[in-house]
């Protein structure tokens, strides 16, 4: 970790880059608000609140130059209770098989297809949470007169079921656009239009695209972006 990267919220206030970190925290809270991910909640005696943690990171470009200060509010998944806060049978993230990616590359090379990569920003926050999950207020979010906790409405990073929820959400989006999901690897999706073909292999919130038509990917990429 970078020496100026805080490991907890309290260290931010003493950090030489305090203002930059506070700006990153504000950006994260704004993103959570836009996604309607959290809602103020009055804790009651039957609630079993989990805890959240701020995670900080200084991001760099591939050439090593500075990119940005990043703050993310994550759930401490280990504080969740199986069967209550999540279904233990629905926690596997959508991770494509290594053989799927290797085959996709081999087919693309043989057919002279074009390759693209993508990542979905804030992917998990787009997936709704089915379970009733509440949490204690983390540093940076103040209590109100009527609330001393938070109701979690979306799949926060760190929740045991978030990766699974996002995978289900993204698969539904792709199938609504006409993609066919592979029965061999559910992280592989294929789209056909006339003589053109486009294949997507997903790895959680990242993906690789191989297509005979870059224009087709441009079109579908915009449609995916409009839905997600």
Which stretches of residues belong to each language-model region?
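Long, low-complexity, charge-biased intrinsically disordered regions
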Residues: 1-228
